[in-house]
Each structure stands twice: as structure tokens, then as C-alpha cells.
């Protein structure tokens, strides 16, 4: 008997007040009629780190391999995971101009957690009224504005 994987829709966004500064991420996950929201904040981080951490946390929350449609307004995250990452891995996590890949800790985590799922990475233009993207944006901003105390150790170690 063939098992069918669950189809899950995930929407993510990251926010940073100042860049670097306090930051947060927002996630909306939908499966059939169920919906779950996740958000968290960090005392000092960057917008790109929050844009990467959101899909990591969302995918890590899935208890089994799923068919995922993941929608984000971050071209950086989407292009990184669908295009740039292949070259980075071949070059030992270096860019084409021999620089260390920024946020490599998160890129490695995203690469790893992506392997167990079948993911359609989609991009949506931010701040254009896309319901779930707007909700993620609010969750992320609220988390960043809540004076978060949590330390983004990956960011601190890169300084």
C-alpha cells in the first residue's frame, strides 16, 4: 500500500529593526483546515538571518516527510536554497569570489532540513496584501518589537 505524504502550506517572513538590530520571524503553517502560527525574536540579528530561520523552524516542526509549498517574500532565501547553494557546497561554502558564505550556519541547517521534504519554493512580493504574508510580517515585526532577550549565537559568532 502506498503512503501519501501530507500536503502542507507554509508562509514565512523575517523582520529586523535596524539591520543589525532586534529581529524576529513569523510563520503560518496550514494543513487541511488546521492552521498554526509560530513566532520568535532575537536581541541582535539581521533581516536575512530571520528570513532564513523562519523556514528552518517551520520545516523542523514537521514530524514526518511532507509535500510542502513554502512561500516567502525573501528572494535571498529562495534563490539561495534553489540556486546558489549547489555552487557553495561544491566550493566548500565559498562564494564565486572566494568569500565565505554569509549565514553559513543557517544555510547548512536549511539545506539539511529541506532534504526530507518535497518542497516547492515560492516567492511572493511583500507588502502587496497577500493575506498569509501580511500575517507573517506582523508576527515577525511583533516578535522583533517585543524587546527579545534571546541571543542569535550564529550572528554573534560571525562578528
Curated annotation (Swiss-Prot):
UniProt superkingdom: Bacteria
Localization per record: Cytoplasm
Cofactor mode of binding and number, as noted: Binds 1 Mg(2+) ion per subunit. May bind a second metal ion at a regulatory site, or after substrate binding.
One MF annotation (Gene Ontology) recorded for this entry: RNA-DNA hybrid ribonuclease activity
Residues bound to Mg(2+) 1: 13, 51, 73
Cofactor: Mg(2+)
GO terms for biological process, alphabetical: DNA replication, removal of RNA primer
Annotated ranges, domain RNase H type-1: 4-145
Role played: Endonuclease that specifically degrades the RNA of RNA-DNA hybrids.
Family: Belongs to the RNase H family.
Quaternary structure and partners: Monomer.
Name the UniProt record assigns to this protein: Ribonuclease H
Primary gene name: rnhA
Amino acid at each position: 500500500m502506498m503512503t501519501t505524504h501530507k500536503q502542507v502550506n507554509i508562509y514565512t517572513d523575517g523582520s529586523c529593526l535596524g539591520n543589525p538590530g532586534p529581529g524576529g520571524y513569523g510563520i503560518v503553517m496550514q494543513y487541511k483546515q488546521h492552521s498554526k502560527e509560530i513566532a520568535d525574536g532575537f536581541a541582535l540579528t539581521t533581516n536575512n538571518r530571520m528570513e532564513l530561520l523562519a523556514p528552518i523552524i517551520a520545516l523542523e516542526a514537521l514530524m514526518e516527510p511532507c509535500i510542502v509549498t513554502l512561500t516567502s517574500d525573501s528572494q535571498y532565501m529562495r534563490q539561495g536554497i534553489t540556486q546558489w547553494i549547489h555552487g557553495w557546497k561544491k566550493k566548500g561554502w565559498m562564494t564565486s569570489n572566494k568569500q565565505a558564505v554569509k549565514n553559513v550556519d543557517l544555510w547548512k541547517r536549511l539545506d539539511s532540513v529541506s532534504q526530507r521534504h518535497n518542497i516547492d519554493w515560492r516567492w511572493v512580493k511583500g507588502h502587496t496584501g497577500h493575506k498569509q504574508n501580511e500575517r507573517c510580517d506582523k508576527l515577525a515585526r511583533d516578535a522583533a518589537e517585543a524587546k527579545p532577550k534571546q541571543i542569535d549565537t550564529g550572528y554573534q559568532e560571525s562578528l
